[in-house]
Amino acid sequence: MPTINQLIAQPRKAQKARNKVPALNACPQKRGVCTRVYTTTPKKPNSALRKVAKVRLTNGFEVIGYIPGEGHNLQEHSVVMIRGGRVKDLPGVRYHILRGVLDTQGVKNRKQRRSKYGAKRPK
């Protein structure tokens, strides 16, 4: 433990919180191009084939984004919009791809929580 004189000479440094979404550069969303669309398996104890895409952003970052909802139309060279938000059981996936924006279509036959999946209001 430092003495009072040591603290006067060199005060304590405040700890900086690390940025959880560094690729966004303090923007709410970023645009990017899919370089690879594939499925991956989650950590234990979960089991599934989660749909993800590797995206090269306009600022040069290459990130992995999760594709939410059932079914998607993404392929290589699709232009997508990305937001922050990790997927807890997929290590390295710290971003979500927005549905219903740019080349990504909304989820078909979605009745509830439509705005989260870019689905239009059913007639």
Swiss-Prot record:
Primary role = With S4 and S5 plays an important role in translational accuracy. Interacts with and stabilizes bases of the 16S rRNA that are involved in tRNA selection in the A site and with the mRNA backbone. Located at the interface of the 30S and 50S subunits, it traverses the body of the 30S subunit contacting proteins on the other side and probably holding the rRNA structure together. The combined cluster of proteins S8, S12 and S17 appears to hold together the shoulder and platform of the 30S subunit.
Q: Which CDD domains match?
A: Ribosomal_S12
A single GO CC term for this protein reads: small ribosomal subunit
**Species this protein is from:** Methylorubrum extorquens (strain PA1) (Methylobacterium extorquens)
Keyword annotations for this protein, in alphabetical order, are: Methylation, Ribonucleoprotein, Ribosomal protein, RNA-binding, rRNA-binding, tRNA-binding
User: Could you cite one Gene Ontology molecular function of this protein?
Assistant: structural constituent of ribosome
Its protein name is: Small ribosomal subunit protein uS12
- Name the InterPro entries for this protein: NA-bd_OB-fold, Ribosomal_uS12, Ribosomal_uS12_bac
One of the GO BP terms on file: translation
The text of the family note is: Belongs to the universal ribosomal protein uS12 family.
For the modification 3-methylthioaspartic acid, the affected residues are 89
